[in-house]
Curated annotation (Swiss-Prot):
InterPro entries: 6-blade_b-propeller_TolB-like, PD40
PANTHER family referenced in this protein's UniProt entry, alphabetically: PROTEIN TOLB, PROTEIN TOLB HOMOLOG
Protein name, per record: Protein TolB homolog
The keyword Signal belongs to this UniProt entry's keyword annotation: yes
Signal sequence, renumbered to the chain: 1-20
Keyword terms of this UniProt record: Periplasm, Signal
Subcellular location field: Periplasm
Chief subcellular location: periplasm
Family: Belongs to the TolB family.
GO CC, one annotated term: periplasmic space
Amino acid sequence: MLRRIFVSTFLVFGIVSLYAKDLEVSVRSEISLLPIHVELKIGPNDAKQQKYLRSLCNTFISDLALGDRLQPSSVKSEALSPPFSIAIVSRYPEIAFTIARGSQNHQQFHSLVLTEDISSNRQKIHEAADKIHYALTKVPGISSGKIVFSLSKNPQDGELKQGELWSVDYDGANLRALTQENSLSITPNWMNIGNCNPYLYVSYKYGIPKIFLGSLENTTGKKVLNLQGNQFMPTFSPRKKLLAFISDTYGNPDLFLQSFSLSKGVMGKPRRVLNETFGTQGNPSFSPDGSKLVFVSNRDGRPRLYIIQIDPEIQTPRLLTKKYRNSSCPSWSPDGKKIAFCSVIKGVRQICLYDLSTGKDYQLTTTPIDKEGPSWAIDSQHLVYSAGNSGESELYLLSLITQKTKKIVIGLGEKRFPSWGGFPNNQ
């Protein structure tokens, strides 16, 4: 019964809507692509590894193209000389990446050593591509991050729904189970701190929703809070070392703040930011500097987005979205300039964007199938979200630059609550 009650609460804010397919984007950011020639130079003793090396080269080219700013190609045009060329030089298991501008000589930029671990090798290629992407564009590459999400299958009659957390690369590769709790695990949210790639999530393994700490290195989640009642929708500010979450400790689902660090854990007692006079609250998301929160409240009868200043002191929230009156799932962009969110438009839940510099709302998707849970890549120009119908849901990438969306092919099951993060701090 409790699980049904709180799944209903998620439904109020559009967290567990179930629906999407081919998608369109109605806002475009024009950026000229920079042509790049990529050449694989296989060492004289590497003939046996030729097929594998070519597959890694293809992955590298896809990684460079992912950010929609570079136009890499292994085919050199006689008519057009690209401004940059990259050579991948193999002396298996060593690989060196060299870069040349125009007709200048190649200079080594990066090197790595391959191992027997295929997954690890792919990650090394992703990280190399992102470093080169940043060097050429001064914009972070986005191929080295991981997408964590909840994967569940339809329960049999009378069974409670179960879902485990998984991680995957942007292209559907390196699919990996992160939890084995035989329960319902939802709403993972990257903390973006440290080298252990920690994330917060909610699990029902104790019967009611509680917040846990997990990581790619340790798949056994650790309970974070010892509060009565239900806690859900966690998000973290690494700048302020603050955990924001929703709890019904006082009866109403309210917004709370809790000081927290990986080394010390919970510090002090949680603070209730707003009380029941501000309606049912949900979906908090921090600004990059941790001074503000965007969240959802049904104070005026329908869920709408509000922003509240929490540092240096808590102030009165202000309404953010006046255009859309049934909104949920806000996600503040890493550059602090935009907030992605969901809103019901003509009966369909769409992905929308709020531009903080202009105060304007934009509808990003238009197809008649519900979309949910947008999460930003580190470049603030790409999103991942879930979309599908009842019993089915897939993950999609969305580019604000090209207007294009792309399905992440994973397999059967409902994929929901994606969170894009875990980017190495080396760009």
